[in-house]
Amino acid sequence: MIEFRQVSKSFHKKKQTIDALKDVSFTVNRNDIFGVIGYSGAGKSTLVRLVNHLEAASNGQVIVDGHDITNYSEKGMREIKKDIGMIFQHFNLLNSATVFKNVAMPLILSKKSKTEIKQRVTEMLEFVGLSDKKDQFPDELSGGQKQRVAIARALVTNPKILLCDEATSALDPATTASILTLLKNVNQTFGITIMMITHEMRVIKDICNRVAVMEKGQVVETGTVKEVFSHPKTTIAQNFVSTVIQTEPSTSLIRRLNDEQVGGFKDYKIFVEETQVTQPIINDLIQICGREVKILFSSMSEIQGNTVCYMWLRFNIDQQFDDTAINQYFKEKNIQFEEVH
């Protein structure tokens, strides 16, 4: 649906060149809720602006719904933009217009009939739960209600793609949760592909099925949300995951336990998925290795509606200890594991 092929974007300020994007490649599939996460300045917003051609790539290709828009003119983009809706952090509503007129604005600009406008706007306001607010003005609404108006406006043209640029950053946690539920409903009800730009890993965890992690203009990691949460490969991805889920004990706790440890030991970090959470893993391991197994840390969470568990295990070892059977057990049970040294 959206594909970036070795995309770079540079800005020239005075005599300085700023590389906002460097060799970015990934694909957003049809019906995805795809998250792009990174700290401020990572290039996230620049990336999303390439999709609706608010910016043009310096190098590479941007493919939208089968069209290479890299070198499209503004005229050439008109039809493509009809299939793209966008919502922003600060809503971008017209304060002098009613909720109804704000939602209707794209249809008014497209010169649709009054009958069509009324029908379509009424449908969208009902969908976002604001039918009773149609005659009010933005200043009379809460932040969550304003974002619902913005979502209705973005959907009123029946787009194939919805771009969300930090759409929940200005909202409190409870309102954020309700907006994410609404966006998930948008995806499921209308089959709209959603691209979420955010710096909040909780947003990725709660709504997205796939994610790209950005740092300094580059995509440093991509994968399903479950993959990235279960085994983040890069330091920045690990840091983002740790803001939502504690996946391992603190360094101070490990240091204290190591100081108290008598004899040799070997530690494993394991990731247990929902189908395995209720299995007697510790009991199995004790029987396999014939020795004590300690749980130094355990944390459960829900990802994509599935319960998962992170554990840090310690085996007391001696010269006769052989980890072959333990490693084989993890592999047979499809338990992701990592030896900690």
From Swiss-Prot:
Q: What class of enzyme is it?
A: translocase
Where does it live in the cell?
A: Cell membrane
Indicate which residues the UniProt annotation says bind ATP.
38-45
Membrane topology type: Peripheral membrane protein
Enzyme Commission number(s) = 7.4.2.11
Q: Does the keyword ATP-binding apply?
A: yes
Q: Which GO terms describe its molecular function?
A: ABC-type D-methionine transporter activity; ATP binding; ATP hydrolysis activity
- Domain spans labelled ABC transporter: 2-241
User: Can you state which reaction this protein catalyses?
Assistant: L-methionine(out) + ATP + H2O = L-methionine(in) + ADP + phosphate + H(+); D-methionine(out) + ATP + H2O = D-methionine(in) + ADP + phosphate + H(+)
Q: Which UniProt keywords apply?
A: Amino-acid transport, ATP-binding, Cell membrane, Membrane, Nucleotide-binding, Translocase, Transport
Which top-rank group of organisms is this from? Answer: Bacteria
Q: Name the CDD domains on file.
A: ABC_MetN_methionine_transporter
Kindly list the GO CC terms recorded for this protein.
plasma membrane
How it assembles, according to the record, is:
The complex is composed of two ATP-binding proteins (MetN), two transmembrane proteins (MetI) and a solute-binding protein (MetQ).
Provide the function of this protein: Part of the ABC transporter complex MetNIQ involved in methionine import. Responsible for energy coupling to the transport system.
Family from the record: Belongs to the ABC transporter superfamily. Methionine importer (TC 3.A.1.24) family.
Q: What is this protein called?
A: Methionine import ATP-binding protein MetN 1
> What organism is recorded for this protein?
Staphylococcus aureus (strain N315)
Q: Which gene encodes it?
A: metN1
